[in-house]
From Swiss-Prot:
It holds the Pfam family SPAN-X. Belongs to the SPAN-X family. Residues 10-35 have a biased composition (Basic and acidic residues). It comes from Homo sapiens. This is Sperm protein associated with the nucleus on the X chromosome N5. Residues 1-40 are annotated as: Disordered.
Amino acid sequence: MEKPTSSTNGEKRKSPCDSNSKNDEMQETPNRDLVLEPSLKKMKTSEYSTVLVLCYRKTKKIHSNQLENDQS
């Protein structure tokens, strides 16, 4: 059997890709959770949504008195 060299000390070395991907996953997950939590809490606290209905009339309403005056 081979003896472990002094550089490895008998431990398996991880490839840079494996260690980077694990570190990235660990770092990204808490950041995403922190960003999503406040928006979810806001949605839970609002029970009812507000609906606004606006009516806009382009022409003015003409009174019957004005019609009589215009015709004469």
